[in-house]
C-alpha cells in the first residue's frame, strides 16, 4: 500500500471571511495471491487499485456600498485505475500447459469546476451559478485461454483464444 496525502489551508485575499483550502492525495493498493491446488492445478489472483485527486475550494466574502457578497469556487481533478486478473494454470501432462485468464480493468478521469456568487442588497438577493464536470472512463472485461503443447522435444505448438469487451464512456455534465 502506498498512500500520500496533503491538505493546505491558506489565508484568503486579505478580506475577513475569505478562505482557500486545497490539497491532493495519491494512493495505490496492490496484492497478489497464489494458491497451489495440486501438482497440476494452480490459481493466481492479482489486483491493483490507484486513486489520485487534487482540489481547491475558495470562499471570498466581500462588501461595497450596500452590497454584501459571497463568491464560492470549487474545483477538482481526479483519476484512478482498477486492474484485476484471475488465472488458472493447468498442466494435464508434462507435454501440455494451459493458462486460462479472466481480466477486468477500469480507468476514470474527472475534471470539475463550480462557481457560485450571491450578492445581497437591502432590497434584493441575486444568485449566479456556473458548473461543469467532465467525467470519462474506459472499462474492459477480457478472457483468454493459452495452450502450449510440445508433442516431441523438437516441436512446440502454441495456440489459444481470447476476447475483450471495451466500454468507453466520455461525457460532460
Predicted regions and their residues:
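Periplasmic-side early beta-strands and strand-to-turn transitions of outer-membrane beta-barrels
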Residues: 1-77, 113
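Face-selective signature of the C-terminal outer-membrane beta-barrel domain
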Residues: 34-52, 77-173
